[in-house]
């Protein structure tokens, strides 16, 4: 749930994310240090385990003094200027991960593969922009692919709500059956979009469906004058990280125990691209 806070010298937009036990400062203007005491107090009151600030780069030293540490960078997040994802843990267990080196090896293995340039091929299935009457099939797709998910995509009403806001979905169909989807969550005020909600039914994997969907979303974003895009991929997923790498995205760091997705609380890799 997004909330705005205002105090002397600063305004900030906070995502109070109870499901993922975190608070995110997704944007701010002014002296962020003046808002930090209230943010930390709210996080402790809500039993949040992690505070995340999408920090403007000149504020990194200020946040470091307040016990925040960098976990990655989002290129172009603030109207073409990078944001440093700085975090402060309020739970020792939330800070710990036993899969870090294994996930490093996944990135190293991907880097050893030569980038595959996109060609003019077309998907073997039907691809189109989703409409509101697709929300039921979309929710069923996400239920089949993910055991848990950080946002309420299992609820058709939530999908409809996002469609009517600033989220664009593209889908892939085998005749009338929805088999794959991806979305772009647009932030027109900050000039970026997040490629997210990527899902493919297991029996349809291996056809590069996600790559086609991402390419379609990128074209849509370019048409809206959005040139900076990013995506968060499960650090344990070779396939999704490889798709982003071969789609021209650059690795930007790893967010530890970032959100509940698929098998539980997972690390997420940052990938960024300028269109």
UniProtKB/Swiss-Prot annotation:
Annotated keywords: Acyltransferase, Transferase
Biotech uses: The use of YodP from B.subtilis for N6-acetyl-beta-lysine synthesis opens the bottleneck for the large-scale production of N6-acetyl-beta-lysine to investigate its properties as a compatible solute.
Pfam families: Acetyltransf_1
Induction: Up-regulated during sporulation, under the control of the sigma-E transcription factor (SigE).
Enzyme category, top tier: transferase
InterPro entries associated with the record: Acyl_CoA_acyltransferase (IPR016181), GNAT_AblB (IPR022525), GNAT_dom (IPR000182)
Catalyzed reactions: (3S)-3,6-diaminohexanoate + acetyl-CoA = (3S)-6-acetamido-3-aminohexanoate + CoA + H(+)
Domain N-acetyltransferase: 125-271
Gene Ontology terms for molecular function: N-acetyltransferase activity
Annotated function: In vitro, is able to catalyze the acetylation of beta-lysine to N6-acetyl-beta-lysine, an archaeal osmolyte produced by methanogenic archaea. Its physiological function has not yet been elucidated.
Extra remark beyond the main annotation: N6-acetyl-beta-lysine is not synthesized by B.subtilis as part of its cellular defense against high salinity.
Protein name (Swiss-Prot/TrEMBL): N-acetyltransferase YodP
Gene that specifies this protein: yodP
């Amino acid at each position: 749930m997004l909330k705005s806070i205002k105090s002397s010298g600063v305004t900030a937009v906070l995502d109070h994310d109870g499901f993922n036990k975190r608070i995110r400062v997704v944007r701010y203007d002014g002296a962020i240090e003046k808002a930090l005491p209230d943010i930390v107090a709210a996080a402790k009151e809500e039993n949040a385990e992690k505070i995340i600030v999408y920090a403007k780069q000149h504020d990194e030293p200020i946040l470091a003094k307040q016990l925040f540490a960098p976990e990655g960078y989002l290129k172009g997040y603030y109207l073409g200027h990078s944001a440093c994802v700085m975090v402060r843990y309020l739970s020792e267990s939330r800070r710990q991960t036993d899969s870090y080196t294994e996930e490093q090896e996944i990135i190293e293995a991907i880097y050893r593969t030569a980038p595959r340039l996109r060609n003019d091929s077309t998907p073997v299935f039907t691809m189109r922009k989703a409409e509101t009457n697709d929300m039921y099939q979309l929710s069923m797709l996400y239920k089949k692919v993910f055991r848990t998910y950080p946002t309420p995509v299992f609820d058709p009403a939530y999908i409809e709500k996002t469609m009517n806001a600033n989220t664009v979905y593209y889908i892939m169909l085998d005749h009338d059956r929805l088999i794959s989807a991806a979305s772009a969550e647009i932030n027109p005020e900050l000039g970026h979009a997040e490629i997210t909600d990527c899902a493919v039914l297991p029996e349809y994997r291996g056809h590069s469906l996600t790559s086609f969907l991402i390419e379609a979303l990128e074209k849509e974003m370019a048409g809206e004058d959005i040139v900076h895009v990013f995506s968060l991929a499960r650090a344990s997923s070779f396939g999704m990280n490889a798709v982003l790498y071969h789609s021209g995205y650059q690795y930007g760091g790893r967010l530890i125990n970032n959100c509940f997705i698929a098998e539980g609380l997972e690390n997420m890799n940052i990938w960024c691209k300028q269109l």
